[in-house]
């Protein structure tokens, strides 16, 4: 049996990153929702750093940015490159970028996979320019988060493979907000869930994608975004 939170699963399933009915389908839907929080570029040559970019699922929804994606997976990065992302292999806890270089930093579906999520957050804020935007999505450390993401989420079509998550790593929302504030970023949180109507249509083969809807509850899957205070 695989250990929980085994990153090797991403390599084993590398051919599924862009499959509309594969195990990463929901990641595609979440990426589209993530892009809604990315502002239009404010300057020519604006840089968007996409941390744990995987196969580059954010790329179709982003225009006008120099899109650089960082990931540890050697199998995912070529797919990101094929979709227009400049790939960098590296560790999200030790970013190989200078301070204050990025106009936008995105960290989607990765905080719940590291043991030091606040260190990842600090690194993301370090490379973000004053006035730049930070965009996150992750899973809350709650009973609902564990039930929806693991008990149900890892067993339904479009959900991730079993044992991909370790619920012990799910994110404390209050600690996340407080840590971001110490870095000069005041986060706004909102929940996300799939449209039930779209999901049923997707199951029936009548849709190729599912809209992710914003909710007031952040007890499960949630987004966070904020602007770094100018210095």
Language-model segments: residues:
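Acceptor-substrate binding/catalytic loop of class I
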Residues: 138, 157-175
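A short glycine-rich, Lys/Arg-flanked "PGG" loop and its adjoining helix->strand segment in the class I
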Residues: 118-130
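Class I SAM-dependent methyltransferase SAM/SAH-binding core
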Residues: 49, 54-94
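A C-terminal cap/extension of S-adenosyl-L-methionine-dependent methyltransferases
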Residues: 174, 178, 182, 186-231
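A conserved beta-strand element that flanks and buttresses the S-adenosyl-L-methionine
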Residues: 106
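Hydrophobic adenine-recognition pocket in adenosine-nucleotide-binding enzymes
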Residues: 110
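Conserved class I S-adenosyl-L-methionine
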Residues: 1-42, 135-157
């Amino acid at each position: 049996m695989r250990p929980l939170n085994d990153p090797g699963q991403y390599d084993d399933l590398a051919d599924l990153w862009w499959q509309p009915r594969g195990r990463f389908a929901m990641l595609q839907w979440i990426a589209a929702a993530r892009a809604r929080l990315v502002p239009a570029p404010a300057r020519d040559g604006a840089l968007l750093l996409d941390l744990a970019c995987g196969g580059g699922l954010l790329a179709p929804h982003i225009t006008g940015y120099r899109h650089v994606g960082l990931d540890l997976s050697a199998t995912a990065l070529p797919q990101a490159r094929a979709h227009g992302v400049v790939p960098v292999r590296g560790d999200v806890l030790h970013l190989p970028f200078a301070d204050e270089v990025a106009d936008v930093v995105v960290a989607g579906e990765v905080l719940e996979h590291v043991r030091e999520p606040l260190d990842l957050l600090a690194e993301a804020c370090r490379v973000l320019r004053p006035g730049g935007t930070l965009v996150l999505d992750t899973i809350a450390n709650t009973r609902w988060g564990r039930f929806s993401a693991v008990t149900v989420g890892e067993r339904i079509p479009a959900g991730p493979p079993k044992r991909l998550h370790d619920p012990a790593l799910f994110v404390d929302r209050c600690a996340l907000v407080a840590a971001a504030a110490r870095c000069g970023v005041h986060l706004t949180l909102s929940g996300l869930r799939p449209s039930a109507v779209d999901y049923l249509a997707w199951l029936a083969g009548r849709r190729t994608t599912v809209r992710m809807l914003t909710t007031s509850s952040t007890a499960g899957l949630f987004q966070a975004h904020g602007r770094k205070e100018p210095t």
